[in-house]
């Protein structure tokens, strides 16, 4: 059973996060291992497996990038361990420039303001790519959506580096 069916949700990228959380809690209560403590071992094992599936499904559908990767995996695209070479040289150049810019921010005289501006630009790029990805997934443009997901991975890693730099800078004050 796929995760969308498990949670009683339509198999599309946009989803009702509150409904997902509600269904998750309902399923957690229904299959919590404590409810099966006095059952035979087979029942306990099945309940534990179901609880694990519920947790994994919830974490997958809850996070936008994981949800997109899951949807693509349902269509035969395995992006989880992929070593796909990015073919978009303009995008790769942009990534190199952004990483160089981020490295330079740490040594700038007005680090906080420059980092804030950089972070704002990066968030806009991520938002644009997520909107593209949503449209592509909804239109079943799987190949294009897979490429967009790959690009979002780069941007997400860069965003994590921004957050790490922010934490280091806050620690310096």
Curated annotation (Swiss-Prot):
GO biological processes: [2Fe-2S] cluster assembly; protein complex oligomerization; protein folding
GO molecular function, one term: protein-folding chaperone binding
Residue ranges constituting the J domain according to the UniProt record: 2-74
Gene3D superfamilies documented for this protein: DnaJ domain, HscB, C-terminal domain
InterPro entries membership: DnaJ_domain, HscB, HscB_C_sf, HscB_oligo_C, J_dom_sf
Domain of life: Bacteria
GO annotations of cellular component type: iron-sulfur cluster transfer complex
Keyword entries, A-Z: Chaperone
Quaternary structure note: Interacts with HscA and stimulates its ATPase activity. Interacts with IscU.
Family: Belongs to the HscB family.
Physiological role: Co-chaperone involved in the maturation of iron-sulfur cluster-containing proteins. Seems to help targeting proteins to be folded toward HscA.
Protein name: Co-chaperone protein HscB
């Amino acid at each position: 059973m796929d995760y969308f069916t498990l949670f009683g949700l339509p198999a599309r990228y946009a989803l009702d996060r509150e409904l997902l959380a509600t269904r998750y809690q309902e399923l957690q209560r229904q299959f919590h291992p404590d409810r099966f403590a006095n059952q035979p071992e087979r029942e306990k094992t099945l309940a534990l497996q179901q609880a694990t599936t519920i947790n994994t499904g919830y974490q997958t559908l809850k996070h936008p990038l994981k949800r997109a990767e899951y949807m693509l995996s349902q269509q035969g695209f395995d992006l989880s361990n992929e070593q796909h070479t990015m073919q978009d040289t303009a995008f790769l150049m942009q990534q190199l420039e952004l990483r160089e810019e981020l490295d330079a921010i740490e040594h700038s005289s007005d680090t906080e303001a420059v980092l804030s501006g950089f972070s704002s630009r990066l968030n806009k790029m991520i938002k644009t790519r997520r909107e593209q990805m949503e449209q592509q997934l909804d239109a079943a443009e799987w190949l294009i959506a897979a490429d967009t997901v790959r690009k979002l991975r780069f941007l997400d890693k860069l965003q994590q580096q921004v957050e790490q730099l922010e934490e280091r800078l806050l620690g310096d004050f």
